[in-house]
Amino acid sequence: MALKFITAEEAASFVHHDDNVGFSGFTPAGCPKVVPGAIAKKAIAEHEKGNPFQIGMFTGASTGDKLDGELARANAIKFRTPYQSNKDLRALLNSHGAQYFDMHLSELAQSLRYGFLGKIDVAIVEAADVTEDGEIVPTSGVGILPTICRMADRIIIELNCRHPKEIRGMHDIYEPADPPYRREIPIYTPSDRIGSDCVKVDPAKIVGVVKTDEPNEGGKFSPLDDVTMAIGQNVANFLVGEIKAGRLPKEFVPLQSGVGNVANAVLGCMGENKDIPAFNVYTEVIQDAVIALMKEGRVKFASGCSLSVSNEVIRDIYANLDFFKDKILLRPQEISNNPEVTRRLGLVAINTALEADIFGNINSTHVSGTRMMNGIGGSGDFTRSAMLSIFTTPSTAKEGKISAFVPMVSHLDHSEHSVKVIITEYGVADLRGKSPIQRARCIIDNCVHPDYKPLLEEYLAMGIKGHTPQNLKCCFAFHEELAASGDMHNVDWSKYNK
């Protein structure tokens, strides 16, 4: 069947008001970049005529501004899931301009197949190649591409020539059977291949192919500073101690790491520490630091869902495919983030906390308990099942006016039962095997900024008798003071003891 080449505007004509639309990619990597803008223009035109036009959006995770940003600014979104990081979309969601369902990334594809989230009308996917018999080669990110292509009534492909056809072979596309027929996912090392090198679809569903020549949108991280470097060193030193104590095997285990400055610092410090052997990565996002360590021989293999790297690095990878092709594997997020595989491989999972309380609970998503930041992403997928789950965070934010550690988290994403270790620039709190009071003292002693230690020690002393000594009269005093004066330093416990 011959492929039909169309414009982005023609592609947008296949997307209707109230459609549920699935998009490929994971972070800006692998996301469609021109059709979403055409849909946004269509929405604006319909709104100017007095007609409704909004769609339900299903993505792999966050996307680029050309997708989430364009559609948010056009008020073209009625529903969005999962993780997001675009400022305009965030504002829309927090103002209730669109409904947002935050969910674990590993669960999205199967939830779609189960019918929990409705049908998929249209799949819009980016490809490095597509054949007339329906073989789609993804680009630098996979996300939920296989599932949305199989479920959608109509498929629109952005054929992006920035990604060479020779990338074929860097993907491992596998969808597990649904219950009651599901079997184990047969991944026993990060480099195991279990699926296909492309996504196979009914070519009759491909309503059009839009040719593009678009780079990935990449946000720049701010330079590493003393705080992030100290966190990185503390993580590396802690892992070396675990190896020497025999709690981690001397061969080490695969690593999962989040994205951002702290993650880059952690990876860099691990790479520099020769007491940590060369290691494998089994993660969701493969970023610049992983590629740098791979070139140095410190990372042996990286399995992920996306190459969320700078355009300079992606050009380097494509120019040296002979070197990288047998060292990188991109999978659907249902596999890259699967808790079954995480537990089998025995990952060290390192993720970032937005806020923690002194008893070891983690808030990854909500500022002051109400305002959505980004979402839980894949942190829950990995944390619960990891051999060793670590959360990192700077001890303070906003020039010290906000403590990352509070009496009680204002929103709970990861409970004390899943969080094994917390690390800041001041040190390491190893919470394994500790009671709530022991955890609190360990966190205050090792992780809390010195300015906030007295306040949190006083709070612990005010705790109501019981296994976990919270004081419900004043457990949110830090948040109340932040709202009142803009500075958590100003907490006055005497206000609560009248």
Regions found by a protein language model. Give the residues of each.
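Conserved alpha/beta enzyme-core scaffold
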Residues: 1-498
